[in-house]
Amino acid sequence: MLVYQDLLTGDELLSDSFPYKELENGMIWEVEGKWVVQGAVDVDIGANPSAEGDGEDEGVDDQAVKVVDIVDTFRLQEQPTMDKKQFIAYIKKFIKLLTPKLEGEKQEAFKKNIEGATKFLLPKLKDFRFFVGESMHDDSCIVFAYYREGATDPTFLYLAPALKEVKC
């Protein structure tokens, strides 16, 4: 199994269990999330409740909770929304922090294509929810989530150069 960590913080953000599609010259990975129900478990032990007292279920008080699989699996933490000015400031800081961590061709491709990726993300800002890894470090790579028109499940966008592949 492959896990993708935030190159800046080491937080796990994604794994190969979630297929991705490359966008913007490979700068952005698009991943489909899914709402899943977690929690309540209905266990049938074969007992006959009508023969056991007043018929009320005295089982465990489980509460079912709906979560997004990617957010839950990688313990992503939601962040406040950003306006255009905040986003540009974040991208400038991100470029400054990430560029020295990339080597050779990866660094050149990053410098060449980050502007296109930024222009791709900018018009969608108002629709995004923002997430970072579990550590919630100030230098974390942001994961962007939004709903396509008519979709019931969120789509996640990752800045691919900030992901480090680790074999588990």
From Swiss-Prot:
Kindly list the places in or outside the cell where this protein is found, as annotated in its UniProt entry: Cytoplasm
UniProt function note: Involved in calcium binding and microtubule stabilization.
- SUPFAM superfamilies in the cross-refs: Mss4-like
Q: What cystine pairs are annotated?
A: none
Species assigned in the record: Cucurbita maxima (Pumpkin)
By sequence similarity, the record places it as follows: Belongs to the TCTP family.
Q: TCTP domain: from which residue to which, for each copy? A: 1-168
Q: What is this protein called?
A: Translationally-controlled tumor protein homolog
Per its UniProt entry, which superkingdom is the organism in? Answer: Eukaryota
